Every structure is written in C-alpha cells, then in structure tokens.
C-alpha cells in the first residue's frame, strides 16, 4: 500500500480566467488530498504507478478549464489535475508491463496513480538505457520537442536540402520548451541565415543568443520592443517563417516582418491563457495583403509519425545538434515540496523556465 498525495480540482474555474493559487482560501482552485492505493485495488489490465517526473505545459490550462470542447472536456471538482509524466510501475495486472518498468503516461498531479485499462493504451514503455536521465523523455524526446520537429518537417514541409537552407526565422516564446528546440532545428538542421528570437528580459535574451551567432534576441518587455524587433530583422518583409507561441501584441508585431507568401505557424498563445481578450488578432489584413500561409499546430494530430520523429530527435541529440543542458529546467517537487506543484506550473506564465519545465516528484533508481 502507498499513501498517494493528489492535487484535485476544488472549485470550478471560469474558463479563460486566472486560477486561484491561495491554498488556504476556500475559493482556491486546487486542493491537496491523500489517498491510499494498493495493488489489491487493481482490476484486470490496470497498473499502479509511482510518479517520477511531471511535465509542465501551458495547455494544461485548457485541460483543466476548457474553452473549447473540441480540444478538451475540462476537469470536474474532485478529479485529479491532468498532467503528462513519467512513472515507475509498482504493480501490474497487465501482461504488457511489469513492476520496475518506466512508462510515459498521463499521471496527473499525483505521487502515485492507478492507470485504468482504457488509459493503459496510451502508455509508452521507456528504455532507461537509451538516455542519461529519464526526464529526457519529457524534454528533448518529449511532446514539446516533437512539436518543434513537426513544425519544421511537416507543417513547414522543409527538407534537408539546399533550397530550404538559409531562411530567416522569427520565433516567439523562444526561451521556452518549444522555442529552444525550434532555434536549434533552424540553426543546426536547416542552416538558418538568421533567427530572431523573442524572449522576456535581458537574461532570457542572452540565453537565446547563446545558441549561435546567427541568433538575435529581442526583449518583448522592452518599451521599444516593436522598433527593436524591426531593427533585428533588418526591416519589414524580411522573415520567411514565423513560429508563434505567444499571440497578442507579439503576434501582431511579428506579422509585419513576414515576406509576401511567407508562413505563419501558430503553436500557442500563452499571453492570452489568463486573459481571453488577448486572443484578439488585429493583423488579419496582413494575411490577405501578404498572401500568408497560416497553419495551426496540435502535436497529437501527428501521433502516427511519433516513432519516426523520435528517432530523428534522438539522432540530433546524439550528434550534438540539440543541447540537452539548454533544453530543460528541473524543479524539486519531492517529499513535502509536492505541495508546490501548482506553483511550479504557474511559473510557466511568468517565464521562470529556460527550455522545458519539469517537476521531479520521486527519485530515479
């Protein structure tokens, strides 16, 4: 038997509005509970997992409180807060998994979880011997790196050939989980002539510029942001591909830089996740006048190609074209620090992370 700590939804939030993180407030969005779990509770096909790492993703905002039922149904009071993670199998009544196996799963914000037979179908067994640390499967070999891969190879339809080399890229949210890998793919695979990397604050600007001499960082918090963005690009109508993770005024400023018939790839809109008014896009006329190609990205649309993509990402890591140390930030959520799990996730929206933000819940063996 194990005593699981679980963060559950306490109060149903208003879709699009900020969550309440004041844990002693009766109106708090979340509640930390404890629950006894044991192998005796397992039904046929089920697993008992110990969570090792949790992935922190902006999209969890909508997994918890849905604004669009086509994307996610949301969470009801008493249900565990959803999150992807890595866990160790403690007990199994499923022939495909044995105690001691590590798996990628939707664990939720919990130290231990029973995975139903229905959800076992989405599990992926992880080979610990192929990586230095298991958290690599959430960073350079995880969903955000897969997103970056598909942006280039599927949505932009780029190939490793001369005609696709030397392009100019604009990347917003460039210091984040998707952005850092996009910078490296642009530079190290597609030989970008320039990457304009938008990040928040001088430290983040210095971080994105550390990826290479062809990277020009621009601070979106700077009062002269729009002018400095134009200067970094060398003027308007200079960018071939704009990979946007932010939305709002950053998106509107970036569209000005795109060439005619350039491509805008919409990957996220983190600036609007706590303020729906920022979903408004005022640059629609430029889509028409510049004849832009606009594509929206959901990584799960490409699930059949995950094995191929992971092989490629693994090769890029092996050959030093993706830097492991610059691709993730780890936070400690072990023991009593598990109480900080919601606050660690909240840090995404104030930009505490460089690369993928991962919470450690239990030690690897």
Swiss-Prot record:
SUPFAM superfamilies: GroES-like, NAD(P)-binding Rossmann-fold domains
Pfam family membership, one: ADH_N_2
Sample GO molecular function, one term: oxidoreductase activity, acting on the CH-CH group of donors, NAD or NADP as acceptor
Signal peptide interval: none
Cytoplasmic side: 1-133, 191-365
Cited InterPro entries: ADH-like_C, ADH_N_2, GroES-like_sf, MDR_fam, NAD(P)-bd_dom_sf
Gene Ontology annotations for the cellular component aspect, listed alphabetically: cytoplasm; cytosol; membrane
Compartment(s): Membrane
Topology of this chain in the membrane: Multi-pass membrane protein
Membrane-side (Extracellular) residue stretches: 155-169
Keywords from the named record: Membrane, NADP, Oxidoreductase, Transmembrane, Transmembrane helix
Transmembrane segments: 134-154, 170-190
PANTHER family in the record: ENOYL REDUCTASE (ER) DOMAIN-CONTAINING PROTEIN (PTHR43205:SF19), PROSTAGLANDIN REDUCTASE (PTHR43205)
Protein name, entry field: Uncharacterized membrane protein YML131W
Organism: Saccharomyces cerevisiae (strain ATCC 204508 / S288c)
């Amino acid at each position: 038997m194990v005593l699981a700590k679980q963060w559950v939804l306490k109060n149903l939030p208003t879709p699009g509005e900020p969550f309440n993180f004041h844990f002693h407030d009766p109106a708090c969005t979340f509640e930390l509970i404890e629950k006894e779990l044991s192998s005796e509770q397992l039904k046929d096909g089920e697993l008992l997992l110990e969570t090792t790492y949790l992935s922190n993703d902006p999209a969890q905002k909508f997994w918890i409180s849905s604004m669009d039922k086509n994307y996610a149904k949301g969470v009801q009071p008493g249900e565990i807060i959803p999150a992807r993670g890595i866990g160790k199998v403690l007990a199994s009544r499923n022939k495909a998994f044995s105690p001691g196996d590590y798996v990628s799963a939707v664990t939720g914000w919990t130290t231990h979880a029973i995975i139903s037979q229905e959800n076992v179908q989405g599990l992926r067994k992880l080979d610990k011997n192929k990586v230095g640390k298991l958290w690599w499967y959430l960073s350079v070999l995880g969903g955000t790196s897969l997103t970056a891969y598909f942006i280039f190879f599927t949505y932009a339809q780029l190939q490793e050939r001369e005609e696709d080399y030397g392009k100019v890229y604009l990347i917003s949210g460039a210091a984040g989980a998707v952005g850092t890998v996009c910078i490296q793919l642009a530079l190290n695979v597609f030989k970008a002539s320039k990457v304009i990397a938008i990040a928040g604050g001088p430290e983040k600007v210095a971080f994105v510029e550390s990826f290479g001499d062809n990277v020009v960082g621009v601070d979106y918090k700077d009062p002269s942001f729009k002018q400095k963005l134009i200067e970094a690009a060398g003027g308007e109508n200079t960018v071939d591909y704009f990979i946007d993770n932010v939305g709002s005024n950053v998106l509107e400023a970036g569209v000005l830089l795109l060439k005619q018939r350039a491509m805008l790839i919409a990957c996220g809109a983190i600036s609007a996740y706590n303020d729906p008014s920022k979903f408004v896009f005022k640059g629609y006329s430029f889509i028409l006048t510049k004849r832009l190609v606009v594509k929206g990205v959901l990584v799960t649309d490409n699930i059949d190609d995950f094995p191929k993509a992971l092989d490629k990402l693994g090769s890029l890591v092996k050959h030093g074209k993706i830097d492991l140390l610059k691709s993730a930030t780890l936070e400690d959520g072990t023991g009593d620090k598990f109480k900080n799990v919601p606050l660690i996730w909240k840090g995404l929206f104030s930009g505490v992370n460089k690369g993928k933000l991962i919470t450690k819940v239990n030690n690897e063996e």
